[in-house]
């Protein structure tokens, strides 16, 4: 159940993507940006992030940033309350759909990972069967094995884990051909949000992500706008997955290093992510020139 946010009031809500937008070249929030955003929040500004990341990596990134508005995480599947350290809301998969998706991935020779939420909303578990998993795919697992808010669970029955739920995400890994076959089979089902990607960190591995219905950053922002009572929405982005939230914003802002298509869709283009550009823009827009 979604609760009204403690910071709820009218005004403008500022939402920034993380990677390539708020985060600098070292993939961190700079001390200057963290200090500025924290002080703006203390002065009443509504500021938060929207990202494909899970809370397990969002939480340490925002550790020095005192923001009170929940962050849109997992591409819109959840709102993460940074102050309370738990989910404010989640968009779950139907258990029967989660079961069918997991069965399909196994038939296609993929290795599914079932992301489930704990009942108290404090963290996620990701459940997987390592049997026969190639080394590059298993490295994806081990890279995430020591995160406080995303805990691994080995299982011999991923289908049963998905059916039992509550399931937030089915992530499956395998060859490009097998993943594309799964995408073709699943895309077009209104009960599912399906995407495909590769990651140069894991060469030769393709990834399938399947969430419940209408999971994207735009839907997450609509929910967040209702939650905060904000009258206007300004978003910041750099990549293709930011376009959906830019389309529902009152004002779309791209950083200088954004993809050309993102800059073309933006109302305003600011400096690069390496120059604290998001924090500086918000401070100027709200008239807090003493922070510049």
Protein language model regions, located:
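Conserved acidic, metal-coordinating active-site core of Asp-based
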Residues: 118-236, 240
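A generic structural signal for well-ordered alpha-helical segments
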Residues: 40, 105, 186-187, 225, ...
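Active-site phosphate-binding/coordination module
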Residues: 28-140
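Short, structured coil segments at secondary-structure junctions
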Residues: 65-67, 75, 189-190, 248-249, ...
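A short acidic, helix-capping loop that chelates divalent metal ions and anchors anionic groups
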Residues: 22, 81, 203-207
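Residue-level detector of anion-binding/catalytic polar loops
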Residues: 46, 111, 193, 251-252, ...
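N-terminal glycine-/serine-/threonine-rich phosphate-binding loop
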Residues: 2-17, 21-47
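Mg2+-dependent phosphoryl-transfer enzymes with acidic/Ser/Thr/Gly-rich catalytic loops
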Residues: 3-13, 29-30, 207-292
């Amino acid at each position: 159940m979604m609760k009204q946010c403690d910071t709820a009031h009218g005004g403008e809500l500022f939402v920034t993507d993380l990677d390539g937008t708020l985060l600098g070249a070292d993939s961190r929030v700079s001390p200057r940006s963290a200090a500025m955003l924290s002080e703006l929040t203390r002065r009443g500004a509504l500021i938060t992030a929207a990202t494909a990341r899970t809370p397990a990596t969002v939480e340490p990134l925002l550790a020095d940033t005192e923001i009170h508005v929940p962050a849109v995480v997992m591409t819109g599947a959840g709102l993460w309350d940074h102050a309370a350290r738990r989910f404010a809301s989640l968009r779950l998969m139907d258990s029967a759909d989660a079961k069918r998706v997991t069965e399909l991935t196994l038939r296609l020779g993929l290795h599914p990972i079932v992301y489930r939420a704990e009942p108290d909303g404090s963290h996620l578990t990701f459940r997987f069967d390592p049997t026969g998993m190639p080394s590059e795919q298993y490295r994806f697992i081990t890279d995430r094995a020591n995160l406080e808010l995303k805990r691994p669970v080995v299982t011999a029955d991923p289908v049963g884990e998905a059916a039992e739920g509550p399931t937030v995400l089915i992530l499956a890994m395998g060859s490009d051909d097998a993943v594309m076959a799964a995408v073709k089979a699943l895309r077009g089902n209104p009960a599912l949000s399906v995407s495909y990607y590769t990651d140069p960190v894991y060469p030769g591995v393709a990834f399938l992500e399947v969430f419940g219905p209408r999971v994207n950053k735009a839907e997450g922002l609509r929910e967040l706008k209702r939650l905060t009572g904000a009258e206007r929405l300004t978003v910041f982005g750099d990549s293709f997955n930011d376009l959906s939230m830019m389309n529902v914003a009152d004002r779309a802002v791209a950083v200088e290093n954004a993809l050309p298509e993102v800059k073309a869709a933006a109302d305003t283009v600011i400096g690069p992510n390496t120059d604290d550009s998001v924090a500086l823009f918000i401070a100027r827009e709200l008239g807090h020139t003493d922070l510049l």
